[in-house]
Each structure stands twice: as C-alpha cells, then as structure tokens.
Amino acid sequence: MDALRRLSVDQWIVYLLYGATLCIPLLPIGGNVLVILAGLLALLFDRQRFSGPLHWLQWTVLAYIIWTGISIINSVNVQWSAMSWGYHIAIYGTVYWLMTYYMNTEERRKRFLSLFCITGVLVCLGAAYQYFYMISTHIHEWVDNVHFPGLMRRMYGTLQNPNLLGEYLLFVLSIGGLGTIQALKEKDWKRCSKMGLALLIMLLCLVLTYSRGMWLSLAVTVFVAGLCVERRLLYALLVVPLVLFFYHGEVSSRLWSLFSGQDTSVMLRWALWDSTMYMVEDFPVFGIGWDAFWMTYPDYNYFIQDPTVIIYHAHNLYLHVAAETGPISLCLFLAILLGHSRNMQKGNTRGIPYRYGMTLVTVSVLVSGLFDHALYSQQVSLVLWQLLGFAMSVIRDES
C-alpha cells in the first residue's frame, strides 16, 4: 500500500494504460473503465502535459474526431448516434492522446510492446479453450453449410467473432513478428525462442478462425515485410500453394473459395456494397451519421428478404466509413493510418518493430478492409488507436 501511495499521477496513468492493454481484448468493459479513469486523472491533475504545439497528424486526428461528430446531425436517430460516438470515438481519442503523451520513455515503450504481445498469447489461450470445449451458437451465421459442410467450428475467443479475432491477431503478429526478426538479428536466442513459440501459437489460432479475408491480409502483410525488412520472408508465401496442392481439408476449401463467388457470404457482400454506394451518393458530405448504418440500410436493402436480419456494417471499411461519415472522413482516416506509418519509417535509429510495426498494422487494416469492417468492433478499433498513439509518442519524441 505504501508503494501505491508513493506513485505519482504520471505513474498511475501509465499503469492504467498497461492495464487497459491487457483488458481491451480480454475484458472490454474493464479496458474502457481503465481508459476513462486514466483520462480523468490526466484531465484533473496533469492538464499542462498536453500544452504545446501539435504535430500535423494530431491535427488530422482532431479533424477526424470533429467530422465524425458533425455527421451525427444526419442520423435517423441522433440520440443513438451521439451516445455511440461517445462510446467509440471519444474513447479512441482519449487512448490516442494518453498513449501519445505518457509512453514518453524507452522503458515504458518496451514494457508496452512486451505486454501487448503477452496479451496476444493470453487471448489465444482463451480462444483455444472456446474452440475445443465450447459449442458456438453462432456457427450457422459464420459458415455456409452448403459449400463448407465439414466446417463445424471457428475460433473467436473473447473477440466474439472469428474475423475480429483474426484482425486482432494480425496486429499482434505484425509487432511480435518484427520483434522476433530484431531478436534474430541481435542473436538473442532466448528471446527469439520465446517469441517464436508465441508467433506459432498465434498463427495457428489465425488459421483456425477460417477467416479468408484475414488469411489474405496476412499474406500481403508478409509480402510487405519481406520487401521492407527481410527478403527471406518472401519464401514463407510458398506455403500457400503447397497447402492448396497437398492438403484437401477445410483450410484448403476456404482458400480455394477465394477464387469463387458462389458461397452466400460473397454474394451478400456484393449486394451490401452496391446498396452502400447508393448511401454515399445520397449523403456525399457528412454521410448518414455515425453508427447509423444498421438503421438506414433497410431503406436501401434489396437482397435480404428477412426483415428480422440486422446488417450492422457494410463488410467493407472504405464504403462503410464513406457512407456513415462521408468521403472526407474516409480520407482523413486513411491519412491518419498512412501518415503514422510513414513517419515511423523515417527514423533510421529506431529498432525494426518501431520503424515498420505501424506499416504492417496499416497494411493489415487496408487489405482486410476490402472484405470486412473489423474496425466496427470497439475492441479492435481501441487496439488500433492505442497503437497509433504509441506511434505518435515516438514521432513526437524524435521530432
């Protein structure tokens, strides 16, 4: 207790951010509470830390926050959109600003990255328990039984959806994989063996999500890592044709289905994208309103005949953001992602995870966003904004 009393406000906020890193993917309500507590402490007792000039990327983040807030005026349910904006965007902005100003030492950053990867392993352990010992009541929603009759379960864990777990694992694999490469180059065999084992666990879990979009994102992410970091990584892509040629189970069936548009999920996506484009045409400036897609879509629906089926998002990041908050908001969001990744690459003195971690995370978001909208999940988005804030802390420190 004496040690707790001696902690400064600065240290309390940092430990709350560490706790949020652990809780966001495992216990989201706990992560939200910790972020809000940290934000209140900073606002009440440490406001002076946030004074001073802002980086242009921080101004872009502010513009995105304001623009999404203004979009609420177009919502068919303004009260709902306002509450949802507070639950999502306000918390994203809070964790971004806190990470920017409190991950301000090398020791804190290393602890955060270590905890981030450890949390990924814990998520995988929980997902493994779910996969082997729990019966999913939603499997019929995630699998086309006509085209994949042998696929009886998919891994989702505490992320509550296979695609969301896949997106989260791509984030952790991007950071952890680069950390493993760094350890290999430094010949730190003990750390390399530990991280290599963790990567294998996470890769296996990613495979068991049976999420085709996330598999494709992983392949593109590995390709980019091979071009930017280590050319020998490109040989890993040879695993894909080998699996398709020699293995004929459900994994290969899902992979082959990428080249076919016959299953219902693909046909549904085409119909959703078509309807969403009409929304963008009708609301070209501020969109239909933050988190108003599921309320507005029935007016544009021509594919789903069951009125009880609710479509929460467009299964496409670009179309969904453009429809809800306008094309300008989409441009701001893309500028945030690409700007942070590009600025992180500029520091030649930084380690590999620092220089290219945000690049690989951005690639995974942009590629998976072509087929799904995993950022609709507050858990996944909060992790992304935490990483963006971490990147900004490094950018500000060196600029």
Task: Name every feature range the model reports, one short phrase each.
Residues 16-20, 38, 94, 110-151, ...:
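Alpha-helical transmembrane segments of multi-pass inner-membrane proteins
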Residues 13-18, 145-158, 270, 305-319:
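Juxtamembrane membrane-water interface segments that cap and precede transmembrane helices
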Residues 1-83, 94, 104-110, 114-117, ...:
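Transmembrane signal-anchor hairpin modules in multi-pass inner-membrane enzymes, especially those
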